[in-house]
């Protein structure tokens, strides 16, 4: 179904339709389009276009559609709809009839697609932050393991000065830290909601756009409707951030490819990230790393194409802007894949420590130490540089390292050189001297490594925040509780019950959108029950359940409660958090009365578990406390 047919007297040519349609790639925005449509339906209630009952009908149908899409997104591609917006509207009308035709009131596909794309960028950006963090974690772990492994440092691909493998790892940790910072800043800048901007002049319906923005998890609404539908800065900025990061990943890949070569023989990559040759049986090729290096140009190309698309483009929406998605999707998918492969390539990598040390000792990499030695004796550096250059030439002619020259041979270059020169030329001393911040001395490497470990430990990449529930959260809580009750995982709870109990609830938020809940009920005996744990469908598996349970346990501990129990059909989840089996006979009588509301009361398959607070061996993850702050 086209959304614009009334103006036309004949159908579009099939070839034009194929050229014009975007469903084959913008189907990836289905979840975001449905989420935005639910929020828009609520805004239409506030301006009298929809009744409360109509909105609830539309929301229920859209939520059912979202679940179907999450289970099988490829089903969308079986449609001949023009784009994802047409597909969602067609599906909604099929479910609720003419009521679905009201949904697009006051909305344009211009502000709709801008909102969908920003929602997708926020979600994808959060995943990329987690992947950057994971790659950094792997580098730091490798750095700790090989803190004292010596490695030759290179300039111009010639041995220059000795470093450590740990120092090399930490160099890339810093590069990825800048990528993390850039992506974080980018996500802050795109945290504005265009919905309600209409085609270009704004919606004709006086809704609260700030409230609408907050309901979708945005920090604020955009401030100019014309800019809102024209803006694709966030697309370019994300691609630019991806391009910068791919440069870093490509350099890391190139280093490791060189270290892995037979000529270097510093490392051996794991079988899991290498492949063989169809002709040469002995080959073990670093394909994962070579593909990272090769795919870097692909990301650059997407950025270049987007810059050219937007150059000199008039304001408001132009069909050229349909070209924003394929390049963005591909660039961020590629970046994500390369981050995953980079982290995988670091796992199981073997370091040939004997070979790296041998290489670090070669190439006259201690020549700078001899120059510094002469400077300490009062020789100007430029003169000492020249003297050492002559000494290196003599050592090369003799076929020996610098430290193998005799004292008499050294004195031929400068009489100030004494027996202590050999100590200064040793590998350990060469490393130990680099004590300034950021240097390669063991002290500085330990300092940098400890700081990196602390920084990563304290960082929260989950995108989850937890807080006490408010009355304004009731719609979300009721929806989640009763969704899981309908499929038999929770006890059903009425609206009036939830209103009375809202003070016992906590909610989780992702991108300022409520996506999880749980409550705690305290009995006269001082025993507490964890109740109504629910996560928004489609958001499971992201750590929210664990986070909200830990938050509730912390709350119980602050109330001096000594034991929290739960009745559950998924005991494995709670046992991973420290809960232990207990007998239902030990539970308060009121719990058994509540079972009367359960549809499975005559064939109960719930397991009783308990968590004893302030008991050795059962501790609460303090991260829940951090998330709440």
UniProtKB/Swiss-Prot annotation:
Q: Which InterPro entries match?
A: Acyl_CoA_acyltransferase, Arg_succ_lyase_C, Argininosuccinate_lyase, ASAL_AGS_AcTrfase, Fumarase/histidase_N, Fumarate_lyase_CS, Fumarate_lyase_fam, Fumarate_lyase_N
Source organism phylogeny: Bacteria, Pseudomonadati, Pseudomonadota, Gammaproteobacteria, Alteromonadales
Gene that codes for this? Answer: argHA
Protein name as it appears in the record: Bifunctional protein ArgHA
Naturally occurring in which organism (per UniProt): Moritella abyssi
| Keywords attached to this entry | Acyltransferase, Amino-acid biosynthesis, Arginine biosynthesis, Cytoplasm, Lyase, Multifunctional enzyme, Transferase
The catalytic activity of this protein is classed by the Enzyme Commission as 4.3.2.1, 2.3.1.1
Report the HAMAP family cross-referenced here. Arg_succ_lyase
Q: What else is known?
A: In bacteria which possess the bifunctional enzyme ornithine acetyltransferase/N-acetylglutamate synthase (ArgJ), ArgA fulfills an anaplerotic role.
Q: Where is this region: Argininosuccinate lyase?
A: 1-499
């Amino acid at each position: 179904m086209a959304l614009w047919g009334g103006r036309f007297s004949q159908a579009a040519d099939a070839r034009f339709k194929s050229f014009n349609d975007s469903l084959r790639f913008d189907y990836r925005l289905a979840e975001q389009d449905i989420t935005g449509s639910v929020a828009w339906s609520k805004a239409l209630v506030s301006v009298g276009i929809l009744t409360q009952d109509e909105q609830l009908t539309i929301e229920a149908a859209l939520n059912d559609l979202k679940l179907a899409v999450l289970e099988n997104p490829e089903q969308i591609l079986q449609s001949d709809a023009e784009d994802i917006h047409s597909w969602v509207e067609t599906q909604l009308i099929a479910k609720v009839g003419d009521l679905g035709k009201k949904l697009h009131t006051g909305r344009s596909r211009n502000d709709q697609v801008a909102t969908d794309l920003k929602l997708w960028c926020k979600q994808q950006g959060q995943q990329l932050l987690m992947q950057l963090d994971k790659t950094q974690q792997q580098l730091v772990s490798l750095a700790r393991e090989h803190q004292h492994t010596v490695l030759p440092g290179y300039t111009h691909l010639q041995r220059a000065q000795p470093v450590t493998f740990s120092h090399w790892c930490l160099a890339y940790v810093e590069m990825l830290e800048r990528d993390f910072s850039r992506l974080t800043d980018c996500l802050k800048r795109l945290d504005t909601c265009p919905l309600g901007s209409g085609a270009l002049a704004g919606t004709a319906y006086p809704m609260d756009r700030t409230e609408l923005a907050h309901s979708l998890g945005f920090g604020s609404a955009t401030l100019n409707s014309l800019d809102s539908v024209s803006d694709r800065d966030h697309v370019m900025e994300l691609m630019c951030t991806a391009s910068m990061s791919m440069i870093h990943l490509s350099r890391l890949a190139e280093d490791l490819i060189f270290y892995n070569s037979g000529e270097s023989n510093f490392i051996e990559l794991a079988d899991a990230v290498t492949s063989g040759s169809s002709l040469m049986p002995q080959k073990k090729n670093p394909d994962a790393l070579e593909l990272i290096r090769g795919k870097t140009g692909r990301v650059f190309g997407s950025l270049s194409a987007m810059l050219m698309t937007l150059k000199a483009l008039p304001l408001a929406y132009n069909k050229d802007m349909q070209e924003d998605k394929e390049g963005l999707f591909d660039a961020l998918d590629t970046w994500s894949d390369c981050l995953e492969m980079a982290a995988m390539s670091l796992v199981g990598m073997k370091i040939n420590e004997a070979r790296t040390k041998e290489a670090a000792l070669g190439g006259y990499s201690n020549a700078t130490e001899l120059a510094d030695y002469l400077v300490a004796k009062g020789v100007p550096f430029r003169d000492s540089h020249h003297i050492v250059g002559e000494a290196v030439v003599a050592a090369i002619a003799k076929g020996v390292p610098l430290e193998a020259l005799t004292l008499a041979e050294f004195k031929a270059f400068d009489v100030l050189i004494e027996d202590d020169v050999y100590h200064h030329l040793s590998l350990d001393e060469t490393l130990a001297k680099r004590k300034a911040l950021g240097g390669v001395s063991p002290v500085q490497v330990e300092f940098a490594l400890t700081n990196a470990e602390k920084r990563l430990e304290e960082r929260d990449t989950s995108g989850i925040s937890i807080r006490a529930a408010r009355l304004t959260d009731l719609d979300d809580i009721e929806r989640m509780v009763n969704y899981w009750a309908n499929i038999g995982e929770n006890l059903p709870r009425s609206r009036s019950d939830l209103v009375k109990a809202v003070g016992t609830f906590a909610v989780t938020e992702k991108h300022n959108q409520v996506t999880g809940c749980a409550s705690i009920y305290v009995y006269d005996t001082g025993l507490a029950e964890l109740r109504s744990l629910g996560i928004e469908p489609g958001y499971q598996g992201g750590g929210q359940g664990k986070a909200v349970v830990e938050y509730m346990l912390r709350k119980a501990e602050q109330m001096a409660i000594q034991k929290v129990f739960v009745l559950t059909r998924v005991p494995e989840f709670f046992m991973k958090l420290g809960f232990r089996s207990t007998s239902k006979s030990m539970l308060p009588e009121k719990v058994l009365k509540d079972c009367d509301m359960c549809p499975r009361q005559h064939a109960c398959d719930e397991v009783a578990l308990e968590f004893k607070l302030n008991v050795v061996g059962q501790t609460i993850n303090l991260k829940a406390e951090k998330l709440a702050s």
